[in-house]
Regions:
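Active-site metal-coordination segments of metallo-dependent hydrolases
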Residues: 62-65, 123, 166
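A short secondary-structure junction signal
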Residues: 93-94, 124-127, 157-160
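Active-site adenylate/phosphate-handling loop in enzymes that bind or generate adenylated species
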Residues: 100-144
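Histidine-centered beta-alpha loop that forms part of the nucleotide-sugar donor binding/catalytic region
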Residues: 17, 117-118, 150
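Alpha-helical elements of Rossmann-like donor-binding domains used by nucleotide-donor carbohydrate transfer enzymes
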Residues: 27-31, 69-72, 96, 100-103, ...
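The feature marks non-catalytic terminal segments
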Residues: 1-5, 69, 76-77, 142-228
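Active-site environment of divalent metal-dependent phosphoester hydrolases
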Residues: 22, 49-52, 89, 118-125, ...
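Active-site rim/loop-helix segments in enzyme catalytic domains that contact anionic ligands
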Residues: 1-108, 137-141, 226
Length: 228
């Protein structure tokens, strides 16, 4: 797989703990894809192997299903897909995983990255955020970082900005429906309610919430402001 940028376009990375965590940022991803000047990379910390229970984890059937579903979602987005191979429910910011992610950042050199809120109540989310922070330090690649909201899992989330996804919301919900083994249609229904609520805050139909990491922001340079 080509891990570099296509045609000199700026790269944007989406660092997710599991397949289906694009539920927090797919509306933004589609907006970037529509502009045609960004190279999108989805980096999954785990394969979501335990998403159907222990038996489906042990026989590998859940992993296989979730890989296919994520491949379909990334194809819909036109995004490159990368795996870090941590284990769902038993993930850590291990040195080898941080080094693997650092090497990937060095190849991709993203302009911006979307990551999990570091104190999400789901441990896999917080571990992926910790690995991403260490990978930036190891690679010396420091993109603009924005944290996505995972609704009930993002405790004490403070939104610094809302991205209008009115033009991409229906495609986002169709993408979430691809996660059949995780009841993707139900995820889409939950996100629709949350994003209608956020949209009302800024006078649009649907919006996603993001928090900035100020330490990674260059003065006068903000990807999310540029696409408004």
């Amino acid at each position: 797989m080509n891990t570099g940028n296509d045609g000199g376009r700026e790269a944007v990375a989406f660092v997710c703990a599991h397949p289906d965590d694009l539920c927090g940022c797919a509306g933004l991803a589609f907006r970037l894809a529509d502009l045609g000047k960004y190279d999108l990379h989805v980096i999954d910390f785990t394969h979501g192997e335990r998403g159907l229970g222990e038996a489906a984890y042990l026989d590998g059937s859940c992993r296989a299903k979730r890989i296919k579903e994520e491949e379909a979602a990334c194809a819909m987005l036109g995004a490159h897909l990368h795996w870090l191979d941590e284990i769902d429910g038993d993930s850590y910011a291990r040195p080898e995983t941080c080094a693997k992610l650092a090497a990937l950042l060095s190849q991709i050199r993203p302009r911006a990255a979307i990551a999990h809120w570091p104190i999400d109540c789901h441990a896999d989310h917080s571990m992926s955020a910790a690995a991403f922070q260490r990978a930036m330090q190891l690679s010396r690649v420091f993109p603009e970082v924005y944290f996505m909201e995972q609704v009930h899992q993002s405790r004490h989330f403070h939104a610094d900005r809302y991205v209008d996804i009115t033009t991409t919301a229906e495609r986002k919900y169709a993408l979430l429906g691809l996660y059949v083994c995780q009841s993707g249609d139900q995820i889409a229904a939950e996100r629709r309610i949350a994003e209608m609520y956020h949209g009302r805050k800024i006078g649009v139909e649907f919006a996603e919430a993001y928090a900035d990491w100020p330490l990674t922001m260059a003065p006068g340079r903000c990807l999310l402001d540029e696409i408004i």
